Amino acid sequence: QIIDQLENIGVEPKIVTLKKDEEVYDCHLAKVEYGVTLLFVNVTESVNATKMRQEFFSNVSHELKTPMTSIRGYSELLQAGMINDPKVRKQSLDKIQKEVDHMSQLIGDILMISRLENKDIEVIKHPVHLQPIVDDILESLKVEIEKRKIKVICDLTPQTYLANHQHVQQLMNNLINNAVKYNKQKGNLNIHSYLVDQDYIIEVSDTGRGISLIDQGRVFERFFRCDAGRDKETGGTGLGLAIVKHIVQYYKGTIHLESELGKGTTFKVVLPIIKDSL
């Protein structure tokens, strides 16, 4: 490819894009007095970032369009008086509410990731109890958990952690939602928190599909979704785990992932305990 370009190179420099071993390079070709210069620039990161942004906006567009279509359809039927059965009317209104909640969550995730990346986040901290936060999240997922007969095992330390309540709620919500979303029928969901030395540790495990070794290295990236084709049935924008990682890093903690395809996934969050956090 470069040789072909060299044969046609004129006075003006040329840029040729090359791919090798999943890496992308821009090759800058220019004539000099005694020949030709070639400058190779690795643009893989830039190309991947552009691709991920395009996929993200495509996902967001789809995630917004689907509930909007549903809301409009049910609203038009109700407005036209075409749904007279009280039970069916309630089901229609419940569906509208569910879609509104979905859009609200989507918009909230987009705003959250933007604030985290721009370091524009709330810093007021209070002692946070994990139990009521987890209870509220499980209650919001009760229908899905019961429908799929997922067994929930919850063992949380009564100790508090000094943090912003919204951050802890967002962190737990994203981890638990994923554990339910990707779990198998009659699977297990384990939520634990405990203290080890000067660390406050949270573990969320499921017995679902698992994450491949290749994807494990990228699950915390913005916009990334494991096996995008397979995820169409579950939805999502690829922001949940990116938000989790940003929150954990804000508290100078770490997050670890253990997973095996077909057996499940465990996320382990380690947060350092600071003075007066208990």
Regions found by a protein language model. Name each.
Residues 79-87:
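Short acidic helix/loop segment immediately C-terminal to the autophosphorylated histidine
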